[in-house]
Amino acid sequence: MFFNKKNNQDELKKLAATEAAKSITTEITLGVGTGSTVGFLIEELVNYRDKIKTVVSSSEDSTRKLKALGFDVVDLNYAGEIDLYIDGADECNNHKELIKGGGAALTREKICVAAAKKFICIIDESKKVNTLGNFPLPIEVIPMARSYIARQIVKLGGQPVYREQTITDNGNVILDVYNLKIDNPLKLETELNQITGVVTNGIFALKPADTVIMATKDSNIVVL
């Protein structure tokens, strides 16, 4: 029998997104993340329209999708605190620490996490790891500092690769760092952010997910 891995993974992403949407309560200020899994969440939100008071988005891409479905997206400065933020991840470890930023929205995502009372991360089982770092670590950097930051990362043992033809919503660029040992995500997140010219990096350990909703390959839901 022919097995389509991508279609199956999409089904799992949709399953996790649908489960997370059940956490939406009345009069909620909802933060919406970015990425393929969140795309399924956005589609599901039409069933919760009456409960959502305000929507805050972490990217221009998600904002376009939300507005296309008739949602009024509000700037975080006007929304204030986010009651619930839902987003995906590129990797998630046993401590609910994450690597994010494959979609280049890591800075706004990290701001939304910081402003949220609760952060639910939605993933399929392929994103669950014991140790972070197999997925290249995205770092958003000020363009003029790109080469300088790359040299500092090499000193830390990483192999930075410039993500060509990618400009973030903030007008910056992305370095994807390969082969970086992430034994202590909290320490490395702090260390990388102290390099001059770094806007932020894709490790979410200072404020990890409060809850992880994971769809397994046998189409079950596991809550971490």
Curated annotation (Swiss-Prot):
Signal peptide: none
Classification via Gene3D superfamilies: 3.30.70.260, 3.40.50.1360
Keywords: Isomerase
Residues of the active site: 109
One BP term from GO: D-ribose metabolic process
GO molecular function term, any single one: ribose-5-phosphate isomerase activity
EC numbers: 5.3.1.6
Residues at which substrate binds: 34-37, 87-90, 100-103, 127
GO-annotated cellular components: cytosol
Xref: InterPro entries: NagB/RpiA_transferase-like, Ribose5P_isomerase_typA_subgr, Ribose5P_isomerase_type_A
Pfam families: Rib_5-P_isom_A (PF06026)
Pathway linked to the protein: Carbohydrate degradation; pentose phosphate pathway; D-ribose 5-phosphate from D-ribulose 5-phosphate (non-oxidative stage): step 1/1
Catalytic function, reaction form: aldehydo-D-ribose 5-phosphate = D-ribulose 5-phosphate
Family: Belongs to the ribose 5-phosphate isomerase family.
NCBIfam families: PRK00702.1, rpiA
PANTHER family reported for this sequence: RIBOSE-5-PHOSPHATE ISOMERASE
Quaternary data: Homodimer and homotetramer.
Biological role: Catalyzes the reversible conversion of ribose-5-phosphate to ribulose 5-phosphate.
The name this protein goes by in its record: Ribose-5-phosphate isomerase A
The organism's taxonomic lineage, starting at the top: Bacteria, Pseudomonadati, Pseudomonadota, Gammaproteobacteria, Thiotrichales
Gene name per UniProt: rpiA
